Design a protein with these regions (language model features):
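A structural signal for multi-pass alpha-helical bundles of membrane permease subunits
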Residues: 2-286
Length: 286
């Protein structure tokens, strides 16, 4: 077969890529340069939306900082807990298969439905959490206190998506070669030293991939915030995606929402690239 003819087989995939990725991005860029809202058409206004975003909308940047905090915190906790659980069931323990399935249950549930259940759990007067804590003289305002509301969002996100991290890390642990562990056992290495000097370094490439995947997903936190707190109290848990939703689908400032979306996309691409390079340099330094 002629080498050039092989490119013919790439065309179907290329068309799909253009249809689901490139065209929407081009449309968003075009939309961001317009003043399209509930009463104006797709009229071209140049960079006015971007000027407004960078000079006259601190709320967007505050929501982005809030998103960064929530994303980084949840992913760190998911990684630590997920690695601990994966390491536990990686070893030969009783009911190993049962625990592997049990730890995956949160990921199998529908996020929106589970968030509604969590909202009921943390209800100030009707929730079982405060019913228990009231016996100790405590009644935290989980969803109406700015600090506790962030903490509640983190709890729900960690519970929902730690199983995904657990699954990736367990797959990585099961794929590790046995020879380094046998050599460490012969040398008399303790379990802690085995983990620090054998398991963790061997898992570094998988850890980097798992963290980046979860950061990408965590940076799009929307459903949890929408159902659990609606961005409140005030704007205490409002993330960038939720703020874009408000501007675009509640206030119908579609052009301005598109400019925020494109700016957000560029920032996330740059941020995740830097994070990936830093993690690679730190974890794969040897």
């Amino acid at each position: 077969m002629n080498f050039k003819h092989k490119y013919v087989f790439l065309f179907p995939g290329l068309f799909v890529l253009i249809g689901i990725l490139i065209f929407p991005i081009i449309f968003v860029v075009r939309l961001s340069l317009s003043g399209w809202n509930s009463y104006n058409g797709l009229n071209f206004i140049g960079l006015e939306n971007y000027i407004r975003l960078f000079t006259d909308d601190p709320r967007f940047w505050q929501s982005f900082l809030r998103l960064s905090f929530l994303s980084v915190t949840t992913v760190i906790l998911q990684y630590v807990i997920g690695f601990a659980l994966a390491h536990m069931v990686w070893k030969d323990i009783k009911f190993q298969r049962f625990f592997r399935v049990l730890f995956l249950i949160p990921m199998m549930t529908t996020p929106v439905i589970m968030t509604v259940i969590w909202r009921t759990f943390f209800h100030e007067s009707l929730g079982p959490v405060n019913d228990i804590l009231s016996n100790f003289g405590m009644s935290p305002k989980w969803l109406t206190d700015p600090v506790l509301a962030k903490f509640t969002v983190i709890i729900v996100e960690v519970w929902q998506w730690t199983p995904f991290m657990f699954l990736l890390l367990l797959a990585g642990l099961l794929s590790l070669p046995k020879e380094p562990f046998l050599a460490a056992a012969i040398d008399g290495a303790s379990p802690v030293r085995k983990f620090l000097y054998v398991t963790f370094p061997l898992m570094a490439p998988i850890s980097i991939g798992a963290i980046i995947i979860r950061l990408i997903e965590a940076s799009k936190i929307m459903d949890t915030v929408y159902v659990l707190t609606s961005g409140g109290p005030g704007t205490a848990t409002e993330t960038s995606s939720f703020y874009i939703f408000i501007k675009g689908l509640r206030e119908f400032q579609m052009g301005y929402a598109a400019s925020m979306s494109f700016t957000y996309l560029i920032i996330m691409i740059i941020s995740l690239t830097v994070i990936a390079k830093v993690l690679t340099k730190v974890l794969l330094k040897d």
